[in-house]
Structures are given as C-alpha cells and as structure tokens.
Amino acid sequence: MRIELRQDKVLIDGYVNAVARDSRPIPDTNGERFVEQIMPGAFARALERAKASNRAIDLLLDHEENRKLGDTDSNVTLVEDNIGLRAICEITDPEVMQKAREGKLRGWSFGFMNARAQEEDAANGLKRRFVEDLDLKEVSLIDERKIPCYAGTSVNTRADDTEETVETRSMEIKEATIEDNSEIDKRAVEQSLKPYKERLNKLQAKEN
C-alpha cells in the first residue's frame, strides 16, 4: 500500500485483495476455520453490476458504517487488474490522516454479500473456499485495531433478520493473537534454549 501525505489530504493506492491467493484462516459463524480465495474476474463482475445499478461502493474505516471516508462516486477508484482489486483514493478525514502519519494504517479489507463459491479440503485439514462471484458492498481501510485476513493486502458479521448477511475480511487484534499463539510459543521456547544449545556445541567442539 502506497501512502502519500499532503498538506490537506492523504493519497492511498493499494490492493484490497490479490486474487487466487489464500487468506489467513477465517472463522465461520460456527467457529470452524477455513481459508479462502477470490477467483479472478469476481471483483470485475461485481464492479460492473454496481455500476449498472448506479450503486456506489463505500470506503469505510474498519468496516464501520458510521466512518464513511468516501465512495466510488466521489474520491475512490476501484478496478480489478491482473493482480487483484486495486483501490486509489484521496482522503481528507483528520483521523485517517493522523493514522497515516503515525504508521497505523495496516492495509485493506472488503465487505461482500451473496458469495457463489466452491469448496475443497485443504492439505492442512481446513476447508478451502473458492469465491467465484460476489456482490461487493464496501472496501475498508484497516488501522491498528484490526488485521486484514488477506496477508497480501475474520469474522463474518451477520446483520439482523431484516437484512442480508455481510461478510467482512478482517480480524480483531485479540482474535488474531489467539490464532497465532502456538507459533509465538514455539519461537519463545526456541529463543530460551538458544544459549544452552550454543554452550553444548562449544563443549562438543572441545571434545572433538
């Protein structure tokens, strides 16, 4: 993500999603985890449908509807190229400008509905979902409070019964930390054993 700060605005250019690449493990509504890929062309078709129906796609902060930063009718350009969904925007929001100065913008995420997908069993025991089509509702800038589900750049948010389900692709920091604890623990153990391994290697070298 490229961030260019100017006196009265910030220019941001980056990829919301790189297509055909696995996400981080995402928990579904039942707590079961899966990985996901958005297939090439899915975003392009979603953008075409939105344009045909005169529906602007919003730019939000952290998927919060009360923190709208713009839309595709004003300050946001969205396009799918050979890498994925690219977003280019100009933002004058003071909070976002401050977060940009402080290096607190982590990346992008997106919210969508009506996913058409195929599933398969992945090698690591998780399900892998291939999203072939979707209706793009919004794209979001993600700050230090969340982590994008797609590393190249979760939770499923269910609305009440009168609205459609909207899936978002970012995780709370606390949730992501829990997911990564086992790897953190391994690194901590390896680091604590390092001095002893070095001493053992020196003793073995002297004996030889």
Stretch-by-stretch model annotation:
Residues M1-K51, N156, V166-K186, Q191:
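Polar/acidic, low-complexity leader/linker segments enriched in S/T/G and N/D
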Residues D22-S23, R67-K68, A117-E119:
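Flexible loop/turn segments at secondary-structure boundaries
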Residues E32-G41, R55-I57, K127-E132:
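Glycine-rich, flexible loop segments associated with nucleotide phosphate handling
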Residues L69-S74:
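A structural microfeature
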Residues I142-N208:
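Protruding loop/beta-arch "assembly-hinge" segments enriched in small, turn-prone residues
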